[in-house]
């Protein structure tokens, strides 16, 4: 049985396109894999705090002096999040574009799971990812058009960032279901959502037909 972690990060609730897309992606995945165990994380409702002196305990070397009660509590949050991430075979992540990047809540989650010795390690030859073997499907929602021009691509630090950071963790199978131009009129929005539906079927069917050994780390 594979484990799927469903993550939403949009602050728009029921008005969110990325939430709509992640729900559809998960439904399509479960249709192909009915026995999949699904966990859900809503970062807009339950976001870890941004990194601070109090939440950096997991980065301290062994033998460091006893941590404060607050540091221990923050460490427990980081440990729960990185363990949940590492246990997942498939992740479906809603990542709307906010001000050319991702929501700060999603960045806070990434900062908690980016742990040396857990999701990556440093070697004499450079960093090595430790979270390989996963499939990650990102629901990307954008008000404008960024993928159709060099200027737009240069402004986009959403999909490119996620591909980079998950690649750093060792994840090579990162897929995107994109709906862009959502704020450019009703016709453009309808076309974007229709294209996303086609992409959902293509991406979940493609991922679902990988060998099970690839899907189960």
From Swiss-Prot:
It comes from the Bacteria. FMN binds at residues 10, 16-18. Keywords: Flavoprotein, FMN, NAD, Oxidoreductase. InterPro entries: Flavodoxin_fold, Flavoprotein-like_sf, FMN-dep_NADH:Q_OxRdtase_AzoR1, NADH:quinone_OxRdtase_FMN_depd. Its EC number is 1.6.5.-, 1.7.1.17. GO terms for molecular function: electron transfer activity; FMN binding; oxidoreductase activity, acting on NAD(P)H as acceptor; oxidoreductase activity, acting on NAD(P)H, quinone or similar compound as acceptor. The keyword Nucleotide-binding does not apply. Its cofactor is FMN. The keyword Nucleus does not apply. Binds 1 FMN per subunit. It catalyses: 2 a quinone + NADH + H(+) = 2 a 1,4-benzosemiquinone + NAD(+); N,N-dimethyl-1,4-phenylenediamine + anthranilate + 2 NAD(+) = 2-(4-dimethylaminophenyl)diazenylbenzoate + 2 NADH + 2 H(+). PANTHER family: FMN-DEPENDENT NADH-AZOREDUCTASE 1, FMN-DEPENDENT NADH:QUINONE OXIDOREDUCTASE. Belongs to the azoreductase type 1 family. Homodimer. Quinone reductase that provides resistance to thiol-specific stress caused by electrophilic quinones. Also exhibits azoreductase activity. Catalyzes the reductive cleavage of the azo bond in aromatic azo compounds to the corresponding amines. HAMAP family: Azoreductase_type1 (MF_01216). This is FMN-dependent NADH:quinone oxidoreductase. The lineage of its organism: Bacteria, Pseudomonadati, Pseudomonadota, Betaproteobacteria, Burkholderiales.
């Amino acid at each position: 049985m594979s484990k799927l972690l469903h993550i939403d990060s949009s602050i728009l609730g029921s008005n969110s396109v990325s939430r709509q897309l992640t729900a559809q992606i998960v439904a399509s995945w479960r249709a192909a894999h009915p026995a999949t165990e699904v966990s859900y994380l809503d970062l807009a409702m339950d976001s870890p705090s941004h990194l601070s002196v109090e939440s950096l305990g997991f980065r301290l070397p062994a033998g460091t002096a006893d941590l404060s009660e607050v540091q221990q509590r923050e460490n427990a949050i980081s440990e729960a999040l990185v363990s949940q991430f590492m246990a997942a075979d498939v992740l479906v992540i809603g990542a709307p574009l906010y001000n050319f990047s991702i929501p700060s809540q999603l960045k806070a989650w990434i900062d908690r799971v980016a742990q040396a010795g857990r999701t990556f390690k440093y070697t004499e030859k450079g960093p090595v990812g430790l979270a390989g073997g996963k499939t990650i499907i990102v629901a990307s929602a954008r008000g404008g058009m960024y993928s159709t021009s060099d200027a737009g691509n240069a402004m986009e630090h959403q999909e490119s960032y996620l591909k980079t950071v998950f690649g750093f963790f060792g994840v090579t199978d990162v897929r995107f279901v994109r709906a862009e131009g959502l704020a450019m009129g009703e016709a453009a929005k309808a076309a974007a959502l229709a294209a996303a539906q086609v992409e959902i079927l293509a991406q979940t069917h493609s991922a679902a037909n990988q060998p099970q050994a690839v899907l189960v780390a």
